[in-house]
A protein has these predicted regions:
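A short alpha-helix-loop-beta-strand transition element characteristic
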Residues: 2-19, 94-101, 235-240, 305
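Active-site/ligand-binding neighborhood in enzyme catalytic cores
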Residues: 61-163, 171-173, 192, 202, ...
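Flavin (primarily FAD) binding-site architecture
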Residues: 191-209
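Conserved flavin/dinucleotide-binding core of flavoenzymes
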Residues: 173-175, 222, 236-378
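Central beta-strand plus flanking loop segment that forms part of the substrate or channel wall
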Residues: 210-239
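Dinucleotide-binding Rossmann-like beta1-alpha1 core, especially the glycine-rich loop
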Residues: 1-52
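Short hydrophobic core segments
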Residues: 164, 183-196
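Conserved beta-strand-loop-beta-strand element in the redox core of flavoprotein oxidoreductases
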Residues: 168-184
Length: 378
């Protein structure tokens, strides 16, 4: 609203239509069939909970923190354990954890690779968002309209295609050297770079040990996405939802409903996360598409001859992001966040990875406001 960018309510599009189907061990299963399936590895009281639901249901039902907003506090260090350990404490076997979380992890490569405290925060944050209501908004024409509007309001020049190579002291300020040799002096520097990109910069300032470790070791989420379009609504032929969760290579198929109405399915997003995303990256775009279309043709014969590859994107292979977002392993949440955003000389930091009260765009914006107050004279 501050930027006069028109917004559209899109939440109803995500909720529209049949819920995602479940394909497990060679079968399409309803919730009732899943609850009775011989291969269901969940405890008796959780048999009817779908694989995609159970990890989040347990995190919400049995939160480890009385106040999820304090997830990063040092006094919670004893709870800064692998999420896999928390799930085991709730009664899930290794087989159940592998199916419920490791196959499509929300954070980390698998449940052993992410802090229980980050998952507790995620559960609390998402719960607070849901409590505010079902509406969800996006900029009309794409969220890049927001950053374009922000750039248009800047008074100085925006220098594109100028990756930074080094930041070093210059008097009381800093000197920025770009890869092309161009140099720029400034009293203050604000870096919003994701840490994999920041690690590529030679920083000529002494960084405290905890902060240096946070900058060097914080991992980023592997996510790789394959977009497909279909020439016909195959789901009308087979009677299934266009979206589905599977235990195979196709993992998670999400219908995209960005037509004139939510009834129109404009495409399919197949998403790999964690270790499966890294496997996709190793195989490469063409091999992934070939295997996806082949597997979907077997799982859902109605798709045969109808699917077309459209766009493939690996966040891990992006030079200036190195992953979709920052996450924290066991032992990192209570050590890294407190030091992550401290100014280093004239260099200040913002970005989602520096924020502890929100994630996503909300976290990035909150951190940007904090950094602006740090560098603007009182």
């Amino acid at each position: 609203k501050q930027l006069d960018v028109p917004m559209a309510e899109v939440g109803h599009r995500y909720r529209h239509g049949k819920p995602p189907g479940l394909y497990f061990a060679g079968e399409h299963l309803t919730r009732e069939q899943w609850a009775q399936h011989a291969g269901n590895p969940f405890p008796a009281a959780m048999k009817s909970v779908m694989p995609a639901e159970i990890a989040f249901a347990l995190a919400s039902k049995n939160p480890p923190l009385a106040d999820w907003t304090q997830w990063y506090a040092a006094e919670n260090g004893a709870l800064d354990i692998p999420f896999a350990q928390f799930l085991a404490q709730q009664g899930l076997s290794e087989e159940a954890i592998a199916l419920a979380y490791n196959h499509i992890p929300y954070h980390g490569r698998d449940a052993g690779d992410v802090s229980n405290l980050l998952m507790a925060f995620n559960s609390g944050f998402v719960g607070s968002q849901m409590a505010a209501g079902p509406e969800s908004f996006a900029a009309e024409g794409g969220n890049y309209k927001i950053t374009d509007a922000m750039a248009a309001r800047l008074k100085g020049d925006v220098l594109l295609d100028s990756p930074v190579a080094a930041i070093e002291p210059e008097g009381k300020g800093a000197l920025v050297t770009c890869r092309d040799g161009a140099r720029y002096a400034a009293d203050k520097i604000v870096s919003s770079l994701p840490l994999p990109a920041f690690r590529q910069i030679e920083l000529g300032f002494d960084v405290p040990k905890d902060q240096a470790e946070a900058h060097a070791e914080t991992p980023y989420q592997p996510i790789t996405i394959a977009h497909l379009t279909t020439s016909e609504p195959f789901w009308e032929q087979d009677g299934q939802s266009p979206s589905m969760w599977s235990d195979g290579f196709s993992s998670q198929v999400i219908a995209q409903r960005y037509g004139e109405t939510a009834d129109e399915v404009t495409g399919l997003m197949v998403q790999a996360r964690g270790n499966l995303a890294l496997e996709w990256d190793e195989l490469g775009q063409d091999a992934v598409y070939d295997r996806l279309i082949s597997e979907l043709g077997k799982i859902r014969p109605a798709t045969k001859g109808k699917l077309k590859p459209r766009h493939f994107h690996s966040w891990t292979q992006e030079e200036f992001s190195g992953g979709a977002w920052a996450y924290y392993k066991a032992g990192q949440a209570t050590r890294f966040l407190a030091a992550m955003a401290n100014p280093v000389g004239p260099v200040h930091f913002c970005g989602e990875h520096t924020e502890y009260s929100a994630r996503g765009v909300e976290g990035a914006l909150a951190s940007a406001e904090r950094a602006a107050l740090e560098v603007v004279p009182a």
